[in-house]
Amino acid sequence: MSRRTKAIAAIAGAASIAIIATGCSPSSDSGEEGGKVELSLATFNDFGYTDELLQEYMDENPNVTIVHNRAATSNDARANYFQKLGKEGLADIEAVEVDWFTEAMQYSDLLAEVPADAKGRWLDWKEAAATDGDGRLVGFGTDIGPQGVCYRSDLFAAAGLPTDRAEVAALLEGDWDNFFNVADQYKAATGKPFIDSANSVLQGLVNQLETAYEEPDGTIVATENPDIEDAYNTVVERAVPISAYAGQWSDDWFASMANGEFAAMLCPGWMHGVISGNAPEVTGWDVADVFPGGGGNWGGSYLTVPANGKNVDEALKLADWLTAPEQQVKAFVNAGTFPSQSDAYEDEGLTAFTNEYFNNAPTGEIGVKRAEAVTVATYKGAQFFQFHDALQNAVTRVFDGVEDQTTSWNTWVTEVSAF
């Protein structure tokens, strides 16, 4: 493994959420007349699996038809997954977000094993997280989410801030206090929020902790971890006042990318496609090679194949193909989903890629540098998703004026103590 790969291998995963909602259709029987197979693929957000990319596979495998369904949110995908896992109704291939992947690994016996010849494809930590106690690899790694800062250069200019991406990186370089100070400066100059959402800051802070809500041995430390309380207080006191929304993924939030409600976002690669897809006519978006506090990773998922599916063998072949380095580089070009495959980091399709939408920013190179900046792999236990979702709700209550800072924290403590 190269020095670069080792540096990137320190990254931990985090989340994604979706744009298009469709239902999950059941798999068709592989024994249909003529050997035709309909494979259902269930994802969320934008994995970069465009119709054109999926058509490549269908052209190479004319007996296969792929039906791609995307859940409305990661929460919806999770609820559907655990409601139906081991029963009926899941897609042939199901995407799982890293924030609840450890939870899924509790049921690894219900998932088909990744073919032996695919092993060793991924960053060490990515593959290890998908390997169960019996040594079975049951998840095909898709992407990771090293974060930079996406910003509107036109809105920065209006506030008297620099607009060149190198100058913006220098402006925002440093700790979170510096980031919030720049945000306060922007708000004072414009009267508008600087960043899209308070809970994106919570995500960024938590993803820089080694331990969040659970210890690796399963010990629950959520309400007793001073780092979590500090993160909550920081978000409520510094991020809420400079944020346009409490959270992300609402209709208004999607629309806000085009209407200038805010000037910046904490931005993993997969967010690039979300921004360009929701603000296609806006010309001011750019990407800076910087992140508060040094480095951060938000994003990353796996493809899993339910072992009781009707087309397990064919589903494994498709999942294998989709997560090969060549296809993940194409997915990155399509949607900014940064590959988790080691060989991809030597591919010029990644390293030399520039994104025309983001003022021709070298987002491939930025992604590699942002990945190298990550030094902490946050442990995310089986209940990470539930604890974190509840803490986001606590921030939202303060943002909406439903509860004050102390009351909302105490509400969270009471709520999660019952988990």
Where are these regions (language model features)?
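Hinge/lid segment of periplasmic solute-binding proteins
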Residues: 97-148, 177, 286-287
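Short helices/loops that flank or line small-molecule/ion binding pockets
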Residues: 78-90, 155-156, 178-185, 238, ...
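C-terminal capping/gating helix-and-loop segments adjacent to ligand/active sites or protein-protein/ligand interfaces
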Residues: 357-415
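Extracytoplasmic/periplasmic substrate-recognition and gating elements
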Residues: 240, 277-340
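Conserved N-terminal structural module of periplasmic/extracytoplasmic solute-binding proteins
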Residues: 2-101, 119, 163, 310, ...
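Structural recognition of the beta-strand scaffold that forms the well-ordered cores
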Residues: 40-43, 67-70, 92-97, 139-141, ...
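Helix-loop-helix "hinge/cap" segment bordering the ligand-binding cleft or interdomain interface
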Residues: 59, 132-201, 214-245, 307-313, ...
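Extracytoplasmic ligand-binding clamshell segments of periplasmic binding protein
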Residues: 74-78, 196-201, 211-288, 408
